[in-house]
Amino acid sequence: MYQLRDVKLSRNTRTLLQIDELTLPAHGLTVVLGHNGSGKSTLLKMLAGQLKPDQGQVLFNHHLVHAFAPRELAKHIAYMPQQIPQPALMQVRELVELGRFAWRGWLQRWQSDDRQAIAQSMDDTDVAHLAQHALDEISGGERQRAWLAMLLAQNAKMLLLDEPSSALDLAHQYQLMNLLRAQVAKQSCAVIAILHDLNLALRYADRIIALQRGTIWFDGTPVNLLTHPALSDLYGIDLDILPREGKHAVAVVA
């Protein structure tokens, strides 16, 4: 579980993020929305221990995130950045195997649970057939799925994903979201994902947090977001709510 208290981060007099109080539970799928530059990636980097606030505290399970040793933190938190590295000549399977480093280190032998975690995560993300391919010879979407496989192999109880569907085709976007929902249910874990697709957020999220200019503009359920009187203000464009078979979709009004 995360707790943020009086958190503020600024750069050159510009406030990137300012959150008085925020609690993120240890279970469920939380989607973070907001326009470009609203502070979404900054928030995720802070949760992952990649950024330290100028003031305030970011606590994970009642301990300061930046006080964890990297390997110990990796047992609890798996993080996919927005710009994923592309190591030259590394094969997909080798990348996925890195997910087990927190548990085995570099020198220990693989155990059966390591091999099982690696194989299962590659099957779940549809990259098993790419195991021997180099990362720089597969597509951006395939590379994104390979990174997700590494995170799943890590077996952390908190997944932090910065735009995990940005390079995926439509079918794999929904496959990804179904997989994340299944992980939450099966592993009793938590997922915090940044998305730009409002419809995906409304369909799959348990909770939505929307940022605007570095502050929390909305925090609640998808249903509550749909009825928010200023929903169009979130992206600065007219939106229309379309009811469909007991659910809702959002359309841009031309």
Where do the PLM segments sit?
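The feature captures the beta-strand-to-loop junction immediately N-terminal to the Walker
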Residues: 33-35
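Conserved ABC ATPase "signature" C-loop
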Residues: 213-214
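Helix-to-loop junction immediately C-terminal to a conserved catalytic motif
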Residues: 48
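Conserved ABC ATPase signature
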Residues: 109, 134-138, 142
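ABC ATPase nucleotide-binding domains
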Residues: 234-254
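Catalytic Walker B motif of ABC-type/P-loop ATPase nucleotide-binding domains
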Residues: 159-163
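Conserved ABC transporter NBD signature motif
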Residues: 56-64, 73
